[in-house]
């Protein structure tokens, strides 16, 4: 079974790389990067501090800070006062940021639909269920 897990992990890494490259192409067609797209997406539901966004994305705070600064300069997001933390403002999308996110998301839906056509829906759901169980198991092992 460990050989099967190792092969699955290799496939997941390969797929993740392909999805990252595909995401870069999708975002680039709207004149943006995947890093911008990810940060726009993660703060689209509610305002977050840069450290909160970094934790959600699983990346460094410094990397997110650079992208957040870029979004602010481009008028896609703004920093607002955080009543819970004087020195860590909240990153909030502007209307322009929401429009850009929507445009990128619409392009991504086209790509996702093509991917969905390549896989049986039941097999896709079973795969996702298995991956979620593995994620839960790995999180439980964390010290």
Curated annotation (Swiss-Prot):
It holds the Pfam family MarR_2. The lineage of its organism: Bacteria, Bacillati, Actinomycetota, Actinomycetes, Mycobacteriales. One of its GO terms (molecular function) is DNA-binding transcription factor activity. It comes from Mycobacterium tuberculosis (strain ATCC 25618 / H37Rv). PANTHER family: HTH-TYPE TRANSCRIPTIONAL REPRESSOR YETL (PTHR33164:SF43), TRANSCRIPTIONAL REGULATOR, MARR FAMILY (PTHR33164). Gene3D superfamilies: Winged helix-like DNA-binding domain superfamily/Winged helix DNA-binding domain. InterPro entries: HTH_MarR-typ, MarR/SlyA-like, WH-like_DNA-bd_sf, WH_DNA-bd_sf. Keywords: Signal. GO terms for biological process: regulation of DNA-templated transcription; response to stress. This is Uncharacterized protein Rv2011c. Residues 1-27 form the signal peptide.
């Amino acid at each position: 079974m460990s050989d099967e897990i190792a092969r699955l992990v290799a496939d997941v890494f390969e797929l993740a790389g392909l999805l990252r490259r595909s995401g870069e192409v999708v975002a680039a067609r709207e004149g943006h990067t995947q890093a911008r797209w990810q940060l726009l997406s993660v703060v689209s539901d509610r305002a977050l501090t840069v450290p909160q966004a970094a934790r959600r994305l699983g990346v460094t705070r410094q990397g997110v800070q650079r992208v957040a600064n870029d979004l602010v300069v481009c008028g896609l997001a703004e920093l607002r006062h955080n009543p819970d933390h004087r020195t860590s403002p909240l990153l909030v999308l502007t209307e322009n940021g929401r429009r850009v996110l929507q445009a990128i998301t619409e392009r991504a839906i086209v790509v996702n639909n093509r991917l969905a056509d390549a896989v049986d829906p039941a097999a896709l759901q079973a795969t996702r269920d298995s991956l979620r169980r593995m994620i839960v198991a790995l999180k439980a092992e964390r010290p």
